Amino acid sequence: MPLDPGCLNGRVMKCLTFFLLLPETLKKSRKSARAQGKVQACYEIVPLALKKKMAAELYPASANTNIANSNATANAKKNALQLQHTAPPPPQLHNLNNNNIESSNWQSFHPTLRERNALMFNNELMADVHFIVGPAGASKKVPAHKYILAVGSSVFYAMFYGDLAEVKSEIHIPDVEPAAFLILLKYLYSDEIDLEADTVLATLYAAKKYIVPALAKACVNFLETSLEAKNACVLLSQSRLFEEPDLTLRCWEVIDAQAELALKSEGFCEIDLPTLEIIVTRETLNTKEDVVFEAVLNWAEAECKRQGLPITPVNKRNVLGKALYLVRIPTMTLEEFANGAAQSDILTLEETRSIFLWYTAANKPQLEFPLIKRKGLAPQRCHRFQSSAYRSNQWRYRGRCDSIQFAVDKRIFIAGLGLYGSSCGKAEYSVKIELKRQGVVLAQNLTKFVSDGCSNTFSVWFEHPVQVEQDTFYTVSAILDGNELSYFGQEGMTEVQCGKVTFQFQCSSDSTNGTGVQGGQIPELIFYA
């Protein structure tokens, strides 16, 4: 097409304006073409507004720069490219889907390597592998980046860069929950750990599967912190599966000290048979044998349901197997046996008859059940006074509160209090004891005890031992009602070493009967450790 002469005259300035806006590389190419004798054709006259837009695209301004047009700002306010002085905030790192990157210059808004990697978590941008996570029908497709995964996990390294590297672009992982897998990936991308009670066990499994020890340790710490009687048996089963000895030890501490609560929990019925056998064999379970027997029956009923079997005595015996003969039935009292196990129908008539004879006959029959009573746990006592005394008209229980605060340096289980009784002979007291943490009542008991007039303390127990965490102050209180004068403690100590546990004491504002650190009542704390 021949060149229009007008382009060399009236429109030459417009062509020059456009030329000045071109990148240097393009200018050089035009100069090179001119040097070879080629004439550059002006194919289109570009409007000024479009030139401005093209210039903005070719030379993007920095985040703190405005391109101003002094002649057209007012008229083109809605259409001109507006650059903000303040950079938009970076996406939140906890967002589980980062497929919302709008800026082509997103790297500028994330100055650290961790932030930039975190932005790639669960992001399709540059993803070079996808995981189909979860069982069929409940799976989720998760994008990922091989390099980041391989840097954080030796399993992923072998999967992507080892001698038998995976070549498929989609990898199926049916044995890991999607939520747990996302928590694992989030840690590998950003070092962030977001654990919840509902997913922590599944996350521990994923961390173990892909050998990410730091995440596994965080899961174990989370479980130890949230451990209590209602979930201790389930966690014991899982700790054995995951081979976590520290968690196993913590589970046993709770199960031993709070055995009745643990055995009566719903979680106990969810454990596997080997874990059931280990628990029932335990020598240090701190509970009565009829509680153990009832728990075993509850487990058998739940197992029948899991296996789709009718709940009958025969099926219960079958699912229990030898576990039934681990219960120490002969160590029950005769009354406990007669009102419980003897009427359960799970024992044969011959077994029931033999056990009754074992209780009553001089010539006792042979039994298949263990005969030796469990040892349980030996309670320990922390004495906070160095001496005790009594004086006429000195100390009297009149229904007012004696209270003290304490803290320990390791986790224990408070079982009860040791209290002073009458200094004037035999006397009966009604007593209410209470344990609180930050004003919240954790346990209380209302009972009576009889004092014989000596200076020894008398034990008053909570219904169940209460777990007490370290480095936190708790308040114990006792309200006694009686007419007689009582003994009281002197030379109180602010710190007491009791075995491996260190107690610290301080005065309580709840105390209205004179008890404090230096003297008064509540001389003993009874605990398991």
Swiss-Prot record:
- Can you give the residue ranges of the BTB domain? 127-197
**Which chain regions cross the lipid bilayer?**
none
Q: Which UniProt keywords apply?
A: Cytoplasm
Which SMART domains does the entry link to?
A: BACK (SM00875), BTB (SM00225)
The knockout outcome noted for this protein's gene is: Embryos show strong defects in late neuronal markers and strongly reduced and disorganized axons while early neural development is unaffected. Muscle development is also affected.
**Tree of life domain:** Eukaryota
S-S pairs: none
* Any one GO CC term of the record: cytosol
Q: Name one Pfam family in it.
A: BTB
Its biological purpose: Adapter protein for the cul3 E3 ubiquitin-protein ligase complex. Involved in late neuronal development and muscle formation.
Q: What is this protein called?
A: BTB/POZ domain-containing protein 6
This protein's species is Xenopus laevis
Name of the encoding gene: btbd6
